[in-house]
Regions:
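Predominantly flavin-linked oxidoreductase catalytic cores and closely associated redox partners
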Residues: 108-109, 116-234
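Glycine-rich FAD pyrophosphate-binding loop
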Residues: 5, 21-47
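An accessory alpha-helical subdomain
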Residues: 78-87, 97-121, 234
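Glycine-rich active-site loop/strand segments that organize a redox cofactor
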Residues: 47-96
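Residue-level recognition of phosphate/Mg2+-coordinating polar/acidic sites
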Residues: 22-23, 37, 58, 81-84, ...
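Small-residue (primarily alanine) positions within well-ordered alpha-helices
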Residues: 12, 16-21
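Flexible, glycine/proline-enriched loop segments at strand-loop-helix junctions
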Residues: 69-73, 100-105, 166-174
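Beta1/beta-strand and adjacent pyrophosphate-binding region of the FAD-binding site
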Residues: 1-12, 30
């Protein structure tokens, strides 16, 4: 029996597990998640509403050293594919402008339908499992786990295929702490410098301090030597 191990139990890891199990029902699929629950970051996405996708999906929406890479990714999928995936799971989707949300308006609905499908497909789920090392062995891999400070991690399983779905580095509390980059490096992949794409603005002695945490439309202008060099609205 083919064994596919998926490192990371966020939305990408769960989606990968669902797709793998549906495409090959005979395969053994295992999700290895280092948090005590799956999809923890889903629950805070979109202020708890979970924006699933955006109908305005073009390379201009992204910044990259290689625009061709962005184009290649976009060409392989679409927002319609995303809607179809979730509706097939039993999740009605609604549009608000270009944004797509679960009709319930609750991120918990997304997590609920995904975990239900994982159970239906018989996907194995291992929580509180911190993967420290993945070693190529023959045509497969040995997967080792332990704590971040563990000097002698233990092998927990062998796998024929491994999918890294660890997320980025944007939300350590929810699980995206950058450990996936280290695992990718161990296979010889090159990681470009990681920078945040969405950050808060810190100001002093301003009435905006009282508005901390409030989300609203606005316009930002960047001045250099008294001249506007860039403006953006959103």
């Amino acid at each position: 029996m083919k064994h596919i191990a998926i490192i990371g139990g966020g939305v990408s890891g769960m989606a990968a597990a669902i797709a793998a199990a549906e495409q090959d029902p005979s395969a053994r699929i295992t999700i290895l998640e280092h948090k005590p629950q799956l999809g923890k970051k889903i629950l805070v996405t979109g202020n708890g509403h979970c924006n699933l996708a955006n109908t305005h999906l073009t390379p201009d929406c992204y910044r990259s050293e290689d625009p061709r890479f962005i184009q290649a990714v976009i060409q392989k999928t679409s927002w319609q594919d995303t809607v179809r995936f979730f509706e097939d799971l039993g999740l009605p989707v609604r549009a608000k402008g270009n944004y797509l949300y679960p009709r319930s308006g609750q991120a918990s609905s997304v997590l609920r339908v995904m975990t239900r499908r994982l159970k239906e497909l018989g996907v194995e789920i291992c929580l509180d499992t911190h993967i420290t090392k993945i070693i190529p062995k023959g045509t497969g891999f040995q997967i080792h786990a332990g704590s971040k400070t563990c000097q002698s991690p233990k092998k927990i399983c062998d796998a024929d295929r491994v999918i890294l779905a660890c997320g980025g580095k944007a939300a350590p509390v929810q699980g995206s702490d950058g450990t996936g980059y280290d695992l990718a490096k161990s296979f010889g992949h090159t990681i470009v410098p990681v920078v945040p794409a969405l950050v808060q603005l810190k100001v002093e002695d301003s009435p905006f301090v009282k508005a901390s945490g409030v989300r609203t439309d606005g316009k930002v202008s960047v001045y250099v030597d008294g001249k506007v060099c860039s403006e953006d609205s959103g």
